[in-house]
Amino acid sequence: MSKKFWSNIFLALGVFLAFAGVATISVSADSSATIESNTSSKIIDGATYEENIRGVIPITLTQYLHKAQTGEKFIVFVGFKECVHCRKFSPVMKQYLQQSQHPIYYLDYGNNGSFSMASQKQITDFYSTFATPMSFMGTPTVALLDNGKVVSMTAGDDTTLSDLQQITADYNNQ
């Protein structure tokens, strides 16, 4: 056998062993790590969420739509207890409720909330109140409605007290 044949065999074997060694390297991450955020890394349970939002006025989807259709000006918090983002946001809502000059209505978006028994038309009508330029972006959402449309809104668990105070300012200036 030729020298070239053996050098090709050794080269192929070397490449194979190099890649085989790379393939057996495993990487793992600590699945219990907590990711810090700009609000809080504390996990908030459902009972604490309910305590944090004490002071909101629960309304049904029918009541919400009636307020919107009659042109009433109001602030609504759309959320639900099982929503991780809503629970994370709830301490900010608690602060806001302590200083709010206006009633804050609460529309339960969860599986057992107002939407669970709503007709398709009611659900469509709800989403139409968030028409251009603002669309419903999920929960938690705090919105100011006037004349049947959202005129000011904030959404997400990174909503700050300042964001909510801006909604109050918009309410006062409408």
From Swiss-Prot:
<protein>
    <recommendedName>
        <fullName>Pediocin PA-1 biosynthesis protein PedC</fullName>
    </recommendedName>
</protein>
<dbReference type="InterPro" id="IPR036249">
    <property type="entry name" value="Thioredoxin-like_sf"/>
</dbReference>
<keyword id="KW-0871">Bacteriocin biosynthesis</keyword>
<keyword id="KW-0045">Antibiotic biosynthesis</keyword>
<comment type="function">
    <text>Probably involved in pediocin PA-1 biosynthesis.</text>
</comment>
<keyword id="KW-0614">Plasmid</keyword>
<dbReference type="GO" id="GO:0030152">
    <property type="term" value="P:bacteriocin biosynthetic process"/>
</dbReference>
<dbReference type="InterPro" id="IPR005985">
    <property type="entry name" value="PedC_BrcD"/>
</dbReference>
